[in-house]
C-alpha cells in the first residue's frame, strides 16, 4: 500500500486547485465517483474525538459524538452553524436511524444501546446479556427487518477518557437484537475488537471491522439471516479501520486511522476487495456516513474535526 503524504499547506485554508489531490484514484473503477470540482471541506473543529456521524435529512443536519467531552454535536447544512445537541451524552459513540427515523445510539458510560423517541424519551434497547452487563457498545446498524445489530469491543471501559474504566463482564461480540421478541443474540464472537459494521446492498453481506491487533475487515454471508462463512475481506495494516459504510454499488468506504500522513482518512474498496480510491485527511478518521440532499455527500468524523466531500457515489 503506497502512502503519499499531502503538502502541509493543503490544510492551511487556501483554495484548492481542482481536482483535489486529497481525493485519490487508485483504480479506474473509482473515477466515476470523484467529482473533479469538489474538495474536502473541514466543516467543524475543536473536538477531542469525533465519532458516530449520522445524517438527519428531514432536519437538514448532521449529528455526531464528541466522546471525551461527553456530548453530541449538531451541524446545520443550510447555515453551517454548530451547536450542542445533547450534553451529557453518556459518552455516546456510534449512531444510526431506524426505519421510523428514530436515533439509535451506543453509550459507553451506561454500557447500553438506546433509542431516542420522537418526544425525546430514551428507550433502553439492550444493556445486558444473560444477566451480565454489556462492555461498551460501539457502533450500530439497523437491518430492514428492524433488527438492531451492534458491536461491543469494550473500548469505553478500558480507560476513564471515554467512559468509566471497568472490568469486562462479557466476551467482545457482535449482537443482534430481535425487533419482535427483544431477544439479544450473540452472532459473532471470533473477533478481538469488533468495531464498525454495515450491510451490503440487499443485505446479502455483513461487513465487520476488527480493530484489534489484526486490523482487518471481515465479510460474512447473510443468506441464512445470520452471519456465516466469515473471511478476511481486507487487511488494513499499517493502520486500521473503524467505521464503515457501503454505497449502492456495493463499494465499501472505510474510515482509516493509525497509518500516519498519506494513510489516514477514508479508503474505498470494490466488492472484490481491491482498494480503488482514498480520501486523505490530516487527522485519523474514526467514522463516516453519507448524507446531503442526494445522499452523495460523505461526512467524515476525524480526530478533532468533521470533514465533508461531495461525490458521485450514493450511500445506502
Region spans (language model):
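Short, conserved, GDST-rich strand-edge loop motifs in beta-rich repeat architectures
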Residues: 6-16, 150-169, 257-260, 311
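Beta-rich, blade/repeat-based domains predominating
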Residues: 39, 45-60, 88-107, 112, ...
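Beta-propeller domains
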Residues: 32, 57-87
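Loop/turn-rich, solvent-exposed surfaces of beta-rich toroidal or solenoidal domains
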Residues: 207, 214-274
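Blade/loop signatures of beta-propeller domains
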Residues: 2-39
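Short loop/turn segments that connect beta-strands within beta-propeller blades
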Residues: 76-80, 117-121, 178-182, 221-226, ...
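A short beta-strand motif characteristic of beta-propeller blades
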Residues: 40-44, 80-86, 123-130, 182-189, ...
Amino acid at each position: 500500500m503506497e502512502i503519499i503524504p499531502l503538502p502541509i499547506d493543503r490544510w492551511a485554508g487556501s483554495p484548492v486547485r481542482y481536482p483535489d489531490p486529497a481525493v485519490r484514484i487508485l483504480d479506474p473503477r473509482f473515477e466515476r465517483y470523484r467529482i473533479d470540482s469538489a474538495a474536502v471541506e473541514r466543516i467543524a473543529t475543536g473536538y477531542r474525538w469525533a465519532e458516530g456521524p449520522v445524517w438527519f435529512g428531514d432536519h437538514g443536519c448532521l449529528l455526531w459524538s464528541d466522546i471525551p467531552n461527553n456530548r453530541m454535536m449538531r451541524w446545520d447544512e443550510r447555515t453551517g452553524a454548530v451547536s450542542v445537541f445533547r450534553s451529557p451524552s453518556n459518552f455516546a459513540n456510534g449512531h444510526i436511524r431506524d426505519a421510523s427515523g428514530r436515533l439509535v445510539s451506543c453509550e459507553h458510560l451506561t454500557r447500553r444501546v438506546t433509542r431516542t423517541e420522537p418526544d425525546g424519551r430514551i428507550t433502553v434497547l439492550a444493556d445486558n446479556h444473560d444477566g451480565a452487563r454489556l462492555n461498551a457498545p460501539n457502533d450500530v446498524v439497523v437491518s430492514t427487518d428492524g433488527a438492531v445489530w451492534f458491536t461491543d469491543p469494550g473500548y469505553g471501559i478500558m480507560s476513564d477518557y471515554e467512559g468509566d474504566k471497568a472490568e469486562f463482564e462479557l466476551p467482545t461480540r457482535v449482537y443482534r437484537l430481535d425487533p419482535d421478541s427483544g431477544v439479544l443474540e450473540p452472532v459473532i464472537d471470533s473477533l478481538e475488537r469488533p468495531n464498525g459494521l454495515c450491510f451490503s446492498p440487499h443485505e446479502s453481506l455483513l461487513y465487520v471491522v476488527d480493530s484489534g491487533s489484526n486490523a482487518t475487515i471481515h465479510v460474512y454471508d447473510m443468506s441464512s439471516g445470520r452471519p456465516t462463512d466469515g473471511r478476511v475481506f481486507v487487511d488494513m495494516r499499517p493502520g486500521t479501520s473503524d467505521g464503515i459504510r457501503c454505497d449502492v454499488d456495493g463499494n465499501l468506504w472505510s474510515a482509516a486511522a493509525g497509518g500516519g500522513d498519506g494513510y489516514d482518512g477514508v479508503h474505498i474498496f470494490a466488492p472484490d476487495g481491491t482498494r480503488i480510491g482514498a480520501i486523505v485527511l490530516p487527522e485519523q478518521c474514526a467514522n463516516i456516513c453519507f448524507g446531503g440532499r442526494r445522499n452523495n455527500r460523505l461526512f467524515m468524523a476525524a480526530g478533532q474535526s468533521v470533514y465533508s466531500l461531495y461525490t458521485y457515489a450514493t450511500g445506502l
